[in-house]
Design a protein with these regions (language model features):
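Bacterial N-terminal signal peptides that target proteins for export
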Residues: 1-13
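N-terminal signal peptide c-region/cleavage motif recognized by signal peptidases
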Residues: 18-19
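An N-terminally biased module of ancient metal coordination in phosphate/nucleic-acid-related enzymes
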Residues: 24-105
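Active-site gating/metal-coordination segments in enzymes
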Residues: 26-27, 40-43, 94-212
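Hydrophobic faces of well-ordered beta-strands that scaffold small-molecule active sites
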Residues: 52-57, 82-84, 107-112, 142-144, ...
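Conserved, mostly hydrophobic/aromatic
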Residues: 56, 74, 134, 142, ...
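Acidic-and-aromatic substrate-binding clefts and catalytic sites of carbohydrate-active enzymes
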Residues: 59-67, 84-94, 116-125, 164, ...
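H/E-rich (His + Asp/Glu) clusters that bind or coordinate divalent metals
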Residues: 63-64, 71, 218, 224-232, ...
Length: 361
């Protein structure tokens, strides 16, 4: 009897081992959904500690009903104003302004650049005229311009293929932005994870695989070259005000952005859509944001849902530890609250945005 029982136990143990081993071998990282077992505080920040201006959002609401719901959500969570980066000129820009026109206190609009006919005689005059027209229609800034190495491809309807922000041909346009007091919001490069091989050593998988930057294309600028192009434009246009998106995509080394802040008073950066990149290193990030509290602005770039806003508030305000937001951010790593002091939050949430919106060259 004892021998039979022992065999049954050994058999069950082997079966359990095999089952676990198979499960381990079959588990894909994209399906990994860890749940924290730590009994640590779970803070719900229903409303931001100070009034918020979201300096980086887009045209997420496509119907009057959706816009009305967005406004209700903003009021509920404490976002008093949202900047909609339309990318667009022409009728595309006009249609966004018209659709949101019922809520002038809640939304600001930024337009793109018009590259139609770039390189041909008269292009710059046309581009400036369209910029002025957009300004009269309601544009109060430029953005989001975007260059991941192949030129400023975000602008609509005509992207600036091969045109980087420091291209001398753009200088009259940048000068006109300064004259009209229109800040220039620009996305250059991507974060370091997106340039690394999508292999077992990349701690940003699977998100880095999704946003991977292919550097095999001839003439494509890399991360450091794109940061140089941004610096050139900021340096050569001191009366223009620039806002680098996403911590200038330097989350793995915020000192890169800090060096630019130290040199150029006309440069700011938003923190949009990089909460998951910086919250795994909370002490480093909090120290950086405290040091440069006058140069950073809140942004989301992640939709219009209340849960999204509250997740960003939790990261900025709480001291929560080791929690996951896989569905929001796509990373498998745990997040940590930055527990920023009130004076930092007040500036990042709203005061710096007011300086940008009302800046005088």
């Amino acid at each position: 009897m004892k021998r039979t029982l022992l065999k049954m136990i050994l058999s069950s143990s082997c079966l359990l081992y095999v089952t676990v081993a198979v499960a381990q071998n079959d588990l894909l990282l994209k399906n990994y959904r860890p749940v924290s077992i730590y009994h640590t505080p779970k803070t719900l920040v229903s409303k931001a500690a100070f009034p918020v201006t979201d300096m980086h959002s887009h045209d997420f609401a496509k119907t009057p009903e959706a816009i009305a719901q967005w406004v209700r959500t903003m009021d509920e969570v404490g976002v008093k104003k949202t900047v909609i980066l339309t990318y667009s000129t022409g009728s595309g820009f006009d249609s966004v302004v018209d659709r949101y026109g019922k809520y002038p206190e809640h939304f600001l609009f930024y337009c793109g650049f018009d590259y139609t006919g770039f390189g041909k005689p008269g292009w710059i005059q046309h581009a400036i005229a369209e910029l002025e027209r957009c300004y009269k229609k309601g544009a109060r800034g430029i953005g989001e311009l975007g260059d991941k190495g192949e030129g400023e491809l975000y602008s609509r309807p005509t992207p600036g293929v091969g045109i980087h922000i420091d291209n001398p041909a753009l200088k009259p346009l940048l000068q006109k932005c300064a004259e009209l007091k229109m800040p220039i919001v620009i996305h250059v490069a991507e974060d370091q994870w997106m340039y690394e091989a999508a292999d077992s050593t990349n701690d940003g998988l699977m998100n880095s695989a999704h946003w991977h930057v292919n550097m095999n294309k001839p003439g494509k600028l890399g991360h450091d070259e794109l940061l140089v192009s941004l610096e050139n434009a900021v340096k050569e246009n001191p009366k223009a005000l620039f806002v680098a998106c996403h911590f200038a995509n330097s989350c793995a080394n915020l000192d890169v952005l800090g060096r630019l802040f130290d040199k150029y008073p006309n440069l700011y950066a938003d923190i949009a859509a990089r909460y998951a990149e910086v919250s795994p290193v909370p002490r480093y990030t909090a120290a950086f944001m405290t040091k440069y509290k006058d140069r950073l602005v809140y942004g989301t770039d992640m939709g219009d849902q209340a849960k999204m806003y509250r997740t960003t508030f939790r990261i900025l305000e709480s001291a929560d530890e080791h929690f996951y937001e896989k569905d929001q951010f796509s990373y498998h790593w745990p997040l940590y609250g930055l527990h920023l002091p009130g004076d930092v939050l007040k500036k990042v949430y709203g005061e710096n945005a007011e300086k940008i919106i009302n800046y005088k060259p």
